[in-house]
A protein has these predicted regions:
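Membrane-interface interhelical connector segments
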Residues: 29-43, 48
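Extended, low-polarity transmembrane helix blocks
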Residues: 1-29, 47-54, 58-133
């Protein structure tokens, strides 16, 4: 079977982008009060919740279409690092009832975004000729 890295990157971008966009749509429908509360609990300004929402929406859309993929992935990964540190750090190596790592969802988002920072969007991206692609 022939390898197609660009098709793999397209599937990867679509997966991360669509899954994150669902979080953004949820906040669009239900508001950002939950995130505001979480931010306030750890001493961060509540207005950052709007930045989280923008990232979950705008960066996700940019990943989906492949426009400035690496730049979108930087924002995406930054939000995931903060989310991991805020809500998912303790206990770090805990397993859930099914045997899965409790933090595997956020880790997939975080490391997926990190991977796209290094690879870019690939041949099937909307933009490909900029350092942020």
């Amino acid at each position: 079977m022939k390898r197609n890295i660009d098709a793999g990157l397209l599937i990867f971008r679509l997966t991360l982008g669509i899954l994150m966009l669902m979080h953004g749509i949820h906040k669009l429908i239900n508001g950002v009060d939950g995130i505001k509360g979480m931010l306030a609990e750890v001493g961060l300004p509540r207005f950052l919740a709007y930045g989280v929402h923008l990232c979950e929406t705008i960066a996700a859309l940019l990943l989906i279409v492949g426009f400035r993929t690496r730049l979108a992935a930087v924002a995406y990964t930054g939000v995931m690092v903060v989310a991991f540190l805020m809500a998912h750090i303790d206990p770090l190596f805990a397993l859930g009832k099914s045997g899965a790592w409790l933090h595997e969802g956020i880790a997939l988002f975080l490391f997926g975004g990190l991977g796209l920072i290094f690879t870019g969007g690939g041949k099937y991206a909307l933009s490909k000729n900029n350092q942020w692609d």
